[in-house]
């Protein structure tokens, strides 16, 4: 036993392993599962202590792309750019989104767009239905024929239906209507235009470069100074002498002999025929027609001409007094008249210039016998306007053809209406509306007359086509 070596205790290796001089052993490594994907470690760049990194949720919209659907480019807080597709969310016009939803969606990446309605876009379908509904009632009430009723589509060129409705209403409600130098056909034509304009205004239909009434409000300025008249250019008209020869049997010749015996005489012309020679010392013409002969106009003329300047100014004063009597509280009607610009042959929507005048011819007519009436015996103010100023303005076809005279090469019609009857047509249409439509009378806006080169007198007609179904012309 004495020669056997001494055995060391078994706890010594353990104490040696756990001594503070050596670090503790690492735990055994576990094997990774094959189905587990470990993302690659991204080393963030070292930042300066003075730089505070932004949150990844912070973003800034750089710009929007106008594609369909729309996109927007945003920049994240970490500097990366992202293209985001905008999703269309329709929000009703009357529904206001709550503030809570806006706060909740402000931090999300989903963009919200509102559907904004363009106020300039007119709902044509609903306007057409509204106008057709009213016209169906009027056509049924005033006995429009079934063929015309079926063909009516509420189009601008279908003014004949409005004219027939007005004619039937006049026969039933205003029988025996008195007119002054106005034909019944022209009066109902103008009433039909005013009615069509009111129906279109009621329905909400608007036209571009076209006025349904064919009229304008003209600030003539012919009553400001005594003896001074102004043409459609707005310039002062020139006074010159005029000698006219007309046939004895014509309408103009007989009227001249009856109304102006001191200025007319019957002579024989160079062909030996008896004619009525009329000499006017107070004729007025446009400044562009000073060098032109009788019944001749330059290519820059407005076509306005008066054989007697004094009679024309009396007619303008009559219309001014007539409007003052009918509308005593008017604010903007002084020295303005309602002028029909387009007769039947000019009332075309293509607006192609015709040969001759491009506006209705304006002629002053004398009211024979009006000067014999006493103002003390008449109490009606509108009638007193004609007694004090016994002349009226008459609007005729742009290129009229008189009886027993040679026809002109341009288009013509029998359009003829006086200035007071133009106002009467507008007044009767307003009465018609109040009697037949429950809705209030819409506000009719008649444009103000402004001179344009399109209204110049045309001595040469533009070439026009007549249509052809063939593909090749030759």
UniProtKB/Swiss-Prot annotation:
Functional description taken from the UniProt entry: Plays a role in the elongation phase of viral strand displacement replication by unwinding the template in an ATP-independent fashion, employing its capacity to form multimers. Also enhances the rate of initiation. Released from template upon second strand synthesis. Assembles in complex with viral pTP, viral pol, host NFIA and host POU2F1/OCT1 on viral origin of replication. Covers the whole ssDNA genome during synthesis. The complementary strand synthesis induces its relese from DNA template. May inhibit cellular transcription mediated by the interaction between host SRCAP and CBP.
Protein name: DNA-binding protein
Family the entry assigns: Belongs to the adenoviridae E2A DNA-binding protein family.
UniProt source species: Human adenovirus F serotype 41
Subunit architecture: Homomultimerizes on viral ssDNA bound to pTP. Forms a initiation complex with viral polymerase, pTP and hosts NFIA and POU2F1/OCT1. Interacts with host SRCAP.
Binding site for Zn(2+) 1: 231, 233, 286, 302
Gene: DBP
UniProt xrefs under Pfam families: Viral_DNA_bi (PF02236), Viral_DNA_Zn_bi (PF03728)
Binding site for Zn(2+) 2: 343, 345, 397, 413
Residue numbers bearing the Phosphotyrosine modification: 142
Region (Flexible loop): 244-278
Broad class of where this protein is predominantly found: host cell
UniProt keyword list: DNA replication, DNA-binding, Early protein, Host nucleus, Host-virus interaction, Metal-binding, Phosphoprotein, Viral DNA replication, Zinc
Region C-terminal arm, DBP binding, residue ranges: 460-474
Ranges for region Disordered: 1-34
Domain notes: The C-terminal arm bridges DBP molecules together, thereby creating a chain.
Biological process, per Gene Ontology: DNA replication; DNA-templated transcription; positive regulation of DNA replication; viral DNA genome replication; viral DNA strand displacement replication
Localization, UniProt: Host nucleus
InterPro entries the record matches: Ad_DBP_C_sf (IPR036367), ADBP_zn-bd_sf (IPR036368), Adenovirus_DNA-bd_a (IPR003176), Adenovirus_DNA-bd_N_sf (IPR036362), Adenovirus_DNA-bd_zn-bd (IPR005376), ADV_DNB2 (IPR037540)
């Amino acid at each position: 036993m004495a020669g056997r070596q001494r055995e060391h205790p078994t706890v010594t290796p353990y104490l040696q392993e756990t001594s503070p001089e050596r670090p503790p052993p690492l735990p055994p490594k576990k094997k990774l599962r094959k189905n587990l994907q470990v993302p690659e470690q991204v080393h963030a760049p070292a930042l300066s202590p003075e730089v505070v990194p932004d949150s990844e949720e912070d973003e800034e919209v750089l710009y929007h792309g106008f594609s369909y659907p729309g996109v927007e480019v945003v920049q994240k807080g970490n500097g990366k750019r992202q293209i985001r597709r905008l999703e269309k969310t329709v929000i009703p016009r009357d529904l206001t989104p709550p503030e809570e939803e806006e706060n909740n969606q402000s931090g999300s990446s989903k963009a919200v767009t509102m559907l904004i309605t363009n106020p300039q876009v007119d709902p044509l379908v609903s306007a057409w239905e509204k106008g057709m509904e009213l016209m169906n009632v009027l056509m049924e009430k005033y006995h429009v024929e079934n063929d015309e009723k079926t063909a009516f589509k509420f189009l601008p060129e279908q003014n004949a239906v409005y004219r027939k409705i007005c004619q039937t209403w006049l026969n039933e409600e205003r029988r025996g209507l008195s007119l002054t130098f106005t034909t019944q056909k022209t009066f109902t034509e103008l009433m039909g235009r005013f009615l069509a304009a009111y129906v279109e205004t009621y329905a909400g239909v608007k036209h571009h470069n076209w006025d349904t009434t064919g009229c304008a409000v003209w600030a003539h300025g012919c009553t400001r100074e005594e003896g001074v008249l102004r043409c459609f250019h707005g310039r002062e008209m020139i006074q010159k002498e005029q000698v006219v020869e007309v046939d004895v049997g014509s309408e103009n010749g007989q009227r001249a002999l009856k109304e102006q015996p001191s200025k007319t005489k019957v002579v024989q012309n160079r062909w030996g025929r008896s004619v009525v020679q009329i000499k006017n010392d107070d004729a007025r013409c446009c400044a562009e027609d000073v060098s032109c002969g009788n019944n001749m106009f330059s290519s820059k003329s407005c076509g306005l001409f008066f054989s007697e300047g004094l009679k024309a100014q009396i007619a303008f004063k009559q219309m001014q007094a007539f409007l003052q009597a009918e509308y005593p509280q008017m604010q903007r009607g002084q020295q303005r008249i309602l002028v029909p610009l387009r007769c039947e042959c000019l009332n075309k929507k293509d607006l192609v210039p015709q040969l001759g005048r491009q506006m209705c011819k304006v002629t002053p007519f004398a009211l024979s016998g009006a000067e014999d009436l006493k103002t003390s015996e008449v109490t009606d103010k509108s009638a007193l306007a004609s007694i004090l100023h016994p002349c009226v303005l008459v609007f005729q076809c742009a290129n009229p053809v008189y009886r027993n005279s040679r026809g002109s090469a341009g288009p013509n019609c029998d359009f003829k209406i006086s200035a007071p009857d133009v106002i009467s047509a507008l007044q009767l249409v307003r009465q018609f509306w109040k009697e037949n439509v429950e809705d209030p009378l819409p506000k009719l806006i008649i444009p103000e007359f402004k001179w344009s080169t399109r209204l110049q007198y045309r001595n040469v007609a533009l070439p026009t086509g007549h249509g052809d179904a063939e593909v090749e012309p030759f």
